């Protein structure tokens, strides 16, 4: 069985590269896929079978086009994606309690986190207990017998390029 990938959703190529380097160094067995906006990521989710879903989403909130909150709401609306753990990385001051409904497992401040913080959070999220919980959720949703996740609705808003 192939290892489930980690999805990196980050519009800054420099930060995306930093995340990839740390993932490759500390988690070489886990494939990664980078998306530079929420629309690309959402399109990828719509083409994946449940077995191909990521084990973790590393998500920047302030994305160009639809933001990370828009993507989180979209993921939450489908049983197949609602339980994927999320590591938020943002320069915004976000409270953990308000984000638990989105399956956010940890938040790192983009301006102050260290490589050790990044690796520790990922190890915590991908611990065997967490993986077992996610696997159990995926088994229960397999009863739907769908080959892929139903079509997504996330679209760019005109003039929204912030």
Protein language model annotation of sequence segments:
Residues 59-61:
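Active-site residues of response regulator receiver
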């Amino acid at each position: 069985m192939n290892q489930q990938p980690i999805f990196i959703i980050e519009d800054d190529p420099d930060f995306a590269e930093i995340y990839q380097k740390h993932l490759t160094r500390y988690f070489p067995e886990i494939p990664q896929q980078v998306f530079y906006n929420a629309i690309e990521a959402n399109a990828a989710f719509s083409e994946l079978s449940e077995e191909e879903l990521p084990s973790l989403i590393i998500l920047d909130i302030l994305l160009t086009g639809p933001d990370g909150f828009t993507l989180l709401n979209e993921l939450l609306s489908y049983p197949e994606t609602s339980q994927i753990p999320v590591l938020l990385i943002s320069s915004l001051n976000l409270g953990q309690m308000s984000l638990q409904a989105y399956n956010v497992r940890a938040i790192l401040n983009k301006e102050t986190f260290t490589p050790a913080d990044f690796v520790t959070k990922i190890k915590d999220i991908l611990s065997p207990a967490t993986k077992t919980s996610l696997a159990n959720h995926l088994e229960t949703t397999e009863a739907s017998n769908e080959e892929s996740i139903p079509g997504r609705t996330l679209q760019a808003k005109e003039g929204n390029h912030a």
